[in-house]
A protein has these predicted regions:
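A conserved regulatory-domain signal marking ACT and ACT-like small-molecule sensing domains
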Residues: 1-89
Length: 89
């Protein structure tokens, strides 16, 4: 199963490193990543593969919300199909 992880917040050093390490600990594979800095704001979208993950999507989503609070970012995870349905015209 694939999911989309989005991250938004004030830019600071180590955001990608922290999130990548967090995902690696749970055996979540990063398939694609796009990130940009808009003025002083960091934005990132990751496409991740959960087929070998050590956690379920619902647990990962809750853990990412908590991690986001800890690092001052908004982090959300959605099933890829739900993300696509919500963002199609």
């Amino acid at each position: 199963m694939r999911a989309v992880l989005t991250v938004v917040g004030k830019d600071k050093t180590g955001i990608i490193a922290k999130i990548s390490a967090f995902l690696a600990e749970r055996n979540v594979n990063i398939l694609d990543i796009s990130q940009t800095i808009l003025s002083e704001y960091f934005t990132m979208i990751m496409l991740v593969d959960l087929s070998a993950a050590k956690t379920e999507l619902s647990n990962l989503s809750e853990e990412c919300l908590e991690m986001g609070k800890n690092i001052g970012m908004s982090i959300h995870v959605q099933h890829e199909e739900i993300f696509n349905a919500m963002h199609s015209v």
